[in-house]
Structure formats: C-alpha cells, structure tokens
Amino acid sequence: MLDDTIVAIATALGEGSIGVIRMSGPDAITIGKKVFRPKYNKEWYQKDNYKIIYGHVINPETGEIIDEVLLSIMRGPKSFTAEDVIEISCHGGIIPLRKVLEVILRNGARHAEPGEFSKRSFLNGRLDLAQAESIIDIIRAKTDAGAKIAVNQLGGKLSEKVNGLQHKVLGLLAKIEAIIDFPEDDIPEENLLGISKECNSLIKEIEHLLAYADTGKIYREGLKTVIVGKPNVGKSSLLNALLHEQRAIVTDIPGTTRDVIEEILSIKGVPLKIIDTAGLRETQDLVEKIGVEKSRELLNQADIVLFVLDATTGISDEDRKVIDLIKDKKVLILINKIDITKNKIDSHEIRQLINFSEIIEISAQKEIGLDKLEETIFNMVVEGKITTTDSIFVSNSRHKHALERAMQHLLEASKGLQEYVPADLVSIDLKSSWEILGEITGNSVTEDLIDRIFSDFCIGK
C-alpha cells in the first residue's frame, strides 16, 4: 500500500552522537506538524522544500518534550521515495530513538517493513530494480572495489546495458511479428539468417556480461577461503598473520582451534571471507569433533582452499587424509615453518597427489611469503584482466541467472531461424528473452519477486 505513511529508525541502534528517524508517505508532513515543535520557524511545513529546522519532538497529548532534534523536510517527488519525506535527527541513544518512533506511530504512521523505503522508490519510478538492489550492496560492501561496483550499478550502468539488450530483442521481435502478420509473403532465406545473426550478436553481448559474473559475485559476497591442515600445522598463525592481529589462539598443543573462526579481509580490493578450521583428525573430544565436522562442511562450499603443510615433518598420513578431501577443489599449498628448518617436503610428490595447485613457502610466524600468497590469490580471482573503475559487473546471482535464461531463449530462437521453424515459435523464445531481461530492471516482474527482494533489506532503508 502506497497510500499510508511509514516510519522506521534509519540508523543502527546503539550509543552515538545522532540517530535518524525516517518517515515517508502522504501524511508525513501532517504527522510532523503534530509531533514537532519548531524553535523559530512556526510555518516550517509550508511549500518550501529541503529545509532543516531546529526544535523539539513532543508528545502532543501532554506537551512533554521527548528530544531536541533537527527536522529535515523533502517533498515528493524530489525525495528518495518520490513521496513526502521527513527525517528527524535526534540523539543517538536507544531510548530517545524509540520514544520518538513511538510518538510518531501513535499519531498515524505505520512501522516500515524491511526495505520498504527502497521498495517505494522503485514502485514510484525513482529507481529501477537493479539500482534498488545495489543500495544493499553499498551498505554491505567489504572493500572499496565492491563499493565501487555497487555505486556504478546504482548510477544505472548495468540497467543501461540491460535496457539496450531489451530494446534490441524487441527489434528482432518486431521483425518476426511482421513475418507472422504477412504469411503470404515469401521471406528470403537471407532475411531469416540475418535475424539469426542478430540473435547471435546479442548472445555474445550477454556472454561478455556473464564472463566475469563469478568475479562480480566475489566482489559482492567475498571469496570463501578455507584454511585446512592437520592439527598444529600453523593454520591459526596464518590467519593472525593475514589479519595482522591475534584473532586466533596459538599454542603448541594440537587441537587448540575447536570451532570455526571466520573473518573478512581485503586483498587488493578483493574481499576474502577467510575461515580458520579445526584441525582435520580423528578425535574423541566432543567439542573438537563438532568443529572437525563443521570444517568438512565448509570445505564443500569453499572457493579456494589454503592447505597448510609443515616443512619440518614432510607429508604425513594425516596430510594425505586431508588431500583426499580437497583434491577436487581449487587449492593453494602453503609449506609453513620454513624459518625453522629446510623444507623437507617434495613438491613433485605433492603435485602427484593434487593436480591443480600452486606451492608457496611461507612462515606464518615471521610473515615470510605472505606477499606472494596475497598476489597469487588476487590473480586467481581476476586473472589480471579486470579493473573495477568503469567495468559493468554482474555481481548479483539473480541477475546472472536471468541473463543465462534470456541467452538460452536467444539460442533457441537463433537455432529455430536457421532450421526454418514456424515464425510464431521463434516469437515465443524472443518474447521470453525480452521478459526475462525485464526481470533485472523490474520492467517485467511479479509482485512476489519484488517482495522477496526487498525483504532482504534492513529496516529503515
């Protein structure tokens, strides 16, 4: 419903200098007049836009002052939601924020659902769906590069590309519809093949967008990087060295790490969701056993596995058991503790055990070899081909799947044209491709999908 007025706390709860209450809807200014008492400008609600007024939020029933505030007024359609919007900046503690929110709710507003402000911005035509989705990506960005990709999407770069693809598909559809409308005309073979070539050209454009979709997803969600190895091989020391802080407990006692430790770090703008696991071994300790099982589960989800070996002992039976678990993954082999002794591990033997692997000698304690490790991880992600300054990244799984489906229908249409199938069947594939592309920007999308997308947003956004 867009005929009611919504309100929510727009900043994180906790102690702070200020907190913001956001209100949007047809009655925002009317409710503001009830609960806000200006210090000077008594006619603050008049037609002027973009005002900030000093005053107090009060309980209109008792006249009690609730908080000293600044009130910002932004009239629709020149606001984020394209509706009348009021934002109240009050003191940032939990109590004043909640008391201000409660008095607004008692005077006619409804508590906003998660993402409802952004949803209204989309429904009112202020943003398209891809742009609206980028807002949550900006909020959740783990690196400067991830934020840059999201800002580009908010600015409409992806939408512009998708709209262009839709326009071209519509042009092809018009040509096919003309054939359907005039079946008595003999259509030259080269005309049909020409339309097929245009389909193939669009397919190549979509393939180009999809080529870096997995990389885009990594920038958005982080590269799931799991550190594995037998107990006491230096996994926790490696985590601490990469984070440049003592995040994990390090002792000489095997099995110190009994649970999974997860942190986010940035390597040249690439976010790593790095996970230190319990040492993989058979154990009777119940807590450690649970940690080992969780480690095995995480291995199945890993984008990259950092397999740590001990340079002082060579490859043990425990190491071979770990290798059996990771041999089908993308693995970096890290030979640790090279500062203590000469490396006793035969790299040729390792390569026989794991087909794809890069071997890097490190000392987690002395931070030797970490620069090479970081460079290798970065190159594995971007393959030396990508900068995020102006690139159009498909970082959202929903967008990726939509492009794949749209491309599949174009492939079917192209194949049908080459095989001279009836034009109305080709038309079905082209229409499907056009509609699926519209799902990305919201040109053709169901209400259920809209609700599902915005439910993932935070309240107040």
Swiss-Prot record:
Protein name per the record: tRNA modification GTPase MnmE
Lineage: Bacteria, Bacillati, Bacillota, Clostridia, Eubacteriales
Subunit structure: Homodimer. Heterotetramer of two MnmE and two MnmG subunits.
Broad EC category: hydrolase
Function noted in UniProt: Exhibits a very high intrinsic GTPase hydrolysis rate. Involved in the addition of a carboxymethylaminomethyl (cmnm) group at the wobble position (U34) of certain tRNAs, forming tRNA-cmnm(5)s(2)U34.
TrmE-type G domain residues: 222-382
Residues given in the record as GTP binding sites: 232-237, 251-257, 276-279
Organism: Desulforamulus reducens (strain ATCC BAA-1160 / DSM 100696 / MI-1) (Desulfotomaculum reducens)
EC number: 3.6.-.-
Binding site for K(+): 232, 251, 253, 256
Protein residues bound to Mg(2+): 236, 257
Binding site for (6S)-5-formyl-5,6,7,8-tetrahydrofolate: 22, 87, 126, 461
UniProt-listed CDD domains: trmE, TrmE_N
